[in-house]
Amino acid sequence: MSTPARKRLMRDFKRLQQDPPAGISGAPQDNNIMLWNAVIFGPDDTPWDGGTFKLSLQFSEDYPNKPPTVRFVSRMFHPNIYADGSICLDILQNQWSPIYDVAAILTSIQSLLCDPNPNSPANSEAARMYSESKREYNRRVRDVVEQSWTAD
């Protein structure tokens, strides 16, 4: 069944295949265009460098008028990522706009990795460490990066 949301997701997927932004990839699951798996690679020259972080994106029939539910499947240590993997990012909540596509969502999340907002913490320990002890924070991030290599 073709709906506006499904047509838009097909367009997003096509664009992602034809012009993939650096360091991200994503695709719908084989039998469900409304559920995507994605990977964000840790940006070079950052504590996240070398990491491979898996996410899931769940779209509703209201897409693109409503944002998807996005979660990290990989374990993360970041001021704006909750323990369950959900992400505190303005464009996924109150700043959502239908102009955002899957590539824009994933690129924004990749940027958030390196540029957290400690004023809106989802993980208070990570936010405190990021603000008070950058060295210790970076060490914890490196641990998460190393775990990303062996996690399923």
From Swiss-Prot:
Active-site positions on this chain: 88
Its EC number(s): 2.3.2.23
Pathway field: Protein modification; protein ubiquitination
BP terms from Gene Ontology: protein ubiquitination; ubiquitin-dependent protein catabolic process; vegetative to reproductive phase transition of meristem
Tissue occurrence: Ubiquitously expressed.
Official protein name in the record: Ubiquitin-conjugating enzyme E2 1
Annotated gene: UBC1
Occurrences of domain UBC core (ranges): 4-150
